[in-house]
Amino acid sequence: MSAEIINGKEIAAEIRREIKQETAQFIAATGVRPGLAVILVGNDPASEVYVRNKGIQAEEVGFLSQIYRLPAQTTQAELLAKIVALNNDPQICGILVQLPLPAHLNAEIVLNTIDPNKDVDGFHPLNIGRLWAGEPCSVPCTPLGCSLILKRYFGDSLAGKKALIIGRSNIVGKPMAALLLQQHATVTIAHSKTPDVPALCRQADIVIAAVGQPELVKGDWIKSGAVVLDVGINRIAVGDKTKLVGDVAFESAKEVAAAITPVPGGIGPMTIACLLKNTLTLAKAIQQSGK
């Protein structure tokens, strides 16, 4: 058996087309163009690529895109002042601070300063609480992308499905668990202190790998017919070159799984598409609230 390769690029492109159409309707009805502000502190090359792609795709769907590139030596007070200004800017409905931040900046304080109603990444404690309570909120973009893929594969309910999340980060693992529970899956979270992760994998109908360890999950860990979502993005050396691989050993896993996301081209494109989806949702909510 060879798995269906889930094409995240195609699904993300379809989502962007829907967002572009909805955005045009929203602008026509309200006269308001959704505004997404992205703050980048420092000059990390990978972050620069991510930020540039976010800006390009935001403009393609009709958003106002504003990118603020701040020097690496920006102080905590200066960064917080910029966030407060954007909180109060009526043109902006979504604010994102690109992570990781330079070591001298406190990411927790920075993220908590973003207005929860403009928190496009869903990292503010209020939105985290809303997510676990099952209330409307901004959902972190990568877990949301995974959830949309699973809905396309299984439908709205995951009742009776055993889901294993490998990784317990605030960005992916924990919010992913909340989303899976909302879809009625039976959820297990594995992490660095979990014994015998392969045994847990072999019981899972759905495996979501998000630990940042190249090809950690082997093909013989995967239950026959499972759906595997690989969130990892790792650069490894191959001879005198480098290549991107996920947290799953793709070649062996695809011979066992029913469906699997590749790296690159799987979850990555979905993350940016969901950022745009969240931005439009926030724009609509702000408009309805009259703020």
UniProtKB/Swiss-Prot annotation:
Stored CDD domains: NAD_bind_m-THF_DH_Cyclohyd (cd01080)
Residues that bind NADP(+): G167, R168, S169, S192, I233
GO MF, any single term: methenyltetrahydrofolate cyclohydrolase activity
Reactions that this protein is recorded to catalyse: (6R)-5,10-methylene-5,6,7,8-tetrahydrofolate + NADP(+) = (6R)-5,10-methenyltetrahydrofolate + NADPH; (6R)-5,10-methenyltetrahydrofolate + H2O = (6R)-10-formyltetrahydrofolate + H(+)
InterPro entries linked: Aminoacid_DH-like_N_sf (IPR046346), NAD(P)-bd_dom_sf (IPR036291), THF_DH/CycHdrlase (IPR000672), THF_DH/CycHdrlase_cat_dom (IPR020630), THF_DH/CycHdrlase_CS (IPR020867), THF_DH/CycHdrlase_NAD-bd_dom (IPR020631)
SUPFAM superfamilies registered for this protein in UniProt: Aminoacid dehydrogenase-like, N-terminal domain (SSF53223), NAD(P)-binding Rossmann-fold domains (SSF51735)
Classification via NCBIfam families: PRK10792.1 (NF008058), PRK14186.1 (NF010783), PRK14188.1 (NF010785)
Stated family: Belongs to the tetrahydrofolate dehydrogenase/cyclohydrolase family.
Name recorded for this polypeptide: Bifunctional protein FolD
Organism: Dichelobacter nodosus (strain VCS1703A)
